[in-house]
Amino acid sequence: MLHVISPAKTLDFETPPITRHFTQPQFLDHAQQLIDELRPLNPQQVSELMDISEKLGVLNAQRFLDWQLPFTTENAKQAVLAFKGDVYTGMQADRFSSQDLAWAQQRLRILSGLYGLLRPLDLIQPYRLEMGTHFANSRGKNLYEFWGNRLTEQLNRELAQAPQPLLVNLASNEYWGAVQARHLSGEVITPTFKDRKNGQYKIISFFAKKARGMMSAWIIQQRLDQAEGLKDFNSAGYRYNPAMSSAREWVFTREEPV
């Protein structure tokens, strides 16, 4: 059983990593191609492309220029420890044991606009390139066309080696769109997290993102390899809600945010 999550815009390259172990991204040559096509953009063009401030445009244009191979622990950091958004706040990977990290390396994948598909210990350098960015490139009009079926094929190769050919989708719609789900050679289950507000269960973005990270950590720390085990997830007050769930969308609800 594999599970996938989204990356984060917020990064932490200052805190020392909790492990010396690392691997290299599997799609590094494709990332290099994207970098080569992004480097000619000036800060204003980067700001307009990503709909970000002038200050962030300057920062990210410089990141494209600074990006260089080879990746080492001196100029890069393990992906699961470098990302620091809401999902990763929920995950708290900096508290993982060495055994947790080793297990996650085999079961967790992070979708990325620049790196394609990352394992937790794959080294990355600082970047910002969301999957939904409308960046016309040598392969098409956006990043979905750039990646094509490559990420799906890699996931299929890994699903073929898993004890159960099941993919748990904990990614956002933006990133899941880079996976051609109908061509996956395994079952897909998408957990959804809803909080009770004004008498109704609703998806509240901040809480849902954090919950996806908590479920990822729970899968890893429980060494979960069977779908049914997901229904026992109960972090932060969430519970599996069979009445609201379907065969492929498993809904977890809670009465009050914790």
Curated annotation (Swiss-Prot):
InterPro entries: YaaA. It comes from Cellvibrio japonicus (strain Ueda107) (Pseudomonas fluorescens subsp. cellulosa). Pfam families: H2O2_YaaD. This is UPF0246 protein CJA_0191. HAMAP family: UPF0246. GO terms for biological process: response to hydroperoxide. Disulfide bonds: none annotated. Belongs to the UPF0246 family. GO terms for cellular component: cytosol.
